[in-house]
C-alpha cells in the first residue's frame, strides 16, 4: 500500500471519530444544561433563603457553608447540600436529642402504652404522660418535615452533580475531538507532501553481488 493512501485513510477515520466525539460532547452538554436548569428552576420555586450573617447563631457560624451563603437565595445544587446538611441537619440534631423520625416513633408508642395503662389504673402521672406524648408527637412532626425537606434538597444536589459530571464528560469529548482533528489534518498535510510513488514499509531488495572466481 502506498504511504500517501494510508495517511489519507487514517486521516479520514480520525475526522470521522472527531465528528462522533463532537456529537457525544453535545449530548453531554445538553444533559448538563438540562440538569442545571431543572435544579435551578425547582429550587427557585421553593423560595428558600439562607439566614443573614448577623442573625446566625454561634453554632450556625461554625458551619462554613452557612457563612459563605449567608443572605443568598438557594438556587444551586451545592447550596442545597449546604442547607440540607449544615442548617437542617444542625437543627435536627438539637431536636429531640438528635433522634430520628423512626426512633421518635418508638418513643411515641411507648408513651401511648404507658398513658393507657396509667389511665386504666387511675395513676397520678396521667397529665405528665399526656404532656410528654404531646411533646414527642410535636417533635416527631417537626423531624418528619425536616427530614423530608433535607432529603428533597439532597436529591436536587445529587441531580446537579450528575449535570456537573456530564459537563466534565463533554469537556473530555471536545478535547479528544480537537486532538483527533489536529492529528487528522497533520496526516492530510503529510499525505499531500508525500510522493505518490512512495510505498509504506517497502521491503528492501537484496543486492546480489557476483562471486569472485
Identify the residue ranges that each predicted region occupies:
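Juxtamembrane extracytosolic/periplasmic "stalk" immediately C-terminal to the first targeting helix
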Residues: 38-45, 200-206
Amino acid at each position: 500500500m502506498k504511504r500517501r493512501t494510508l495517511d489519507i485513510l487514517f486521516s479520514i477515520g480520525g475526522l470521522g471519530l472527531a465528528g462522533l466525539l463532537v456529537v457525544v460532547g453535545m449530548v453531554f452538554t445538553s444533559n448538563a444544561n438540562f440538569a442545571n436548569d431543572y435544579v435551578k428552576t425547582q429550587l427557585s420555586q421553593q423560595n428558600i433563603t439562607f439566614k443573614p450573617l448577623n442573625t446566625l447563631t454561634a453554632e450556625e457560624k461554625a458551619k462554613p457553608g452557612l457563612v459563605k451563603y449567608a443572605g443568598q437565595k438557594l438556587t444551586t445544587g451545592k447550596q442545597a447540600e449546604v442547607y440540607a446538611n449544615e442548617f437542617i441537619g444542625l437543627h435536627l440534631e438539637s431536636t429531640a436529642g438528635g433522634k430520628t423520625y423512626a426512633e421518635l416513633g418508638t418513643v411515641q408508642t411507648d408513651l401511648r402504652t404507658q398513658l393507657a395503662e396509667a389511665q386504666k389504673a387511675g395513676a397520678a402521672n396521667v397529665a405528665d404522660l399526656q404532656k410528654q406524648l404531646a411533646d414527642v408527637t410535636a417533635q416527631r412532626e417537626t423531624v418528619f418535615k425536616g427530614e423530608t425537606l433535607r432529603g428533597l434538597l439532597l436529591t436536587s444536589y445529587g441531580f446537579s452533580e450528575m449535570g456537573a459530571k456530564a459537563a466534565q464528560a463533554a469537556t473530555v469529548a471536545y478535547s479528544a475531538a480537537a486532538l483527533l482533528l489536529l492529528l487528522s489534518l497533520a496526516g492530510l498535510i503529510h499525505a499531500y507532501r508525500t510522493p505518490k510513488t512512495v510505498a509504506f514499509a517497502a521491503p528492501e531488495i537484496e543486492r546480489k553481488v557476483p562471486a569472485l572466481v
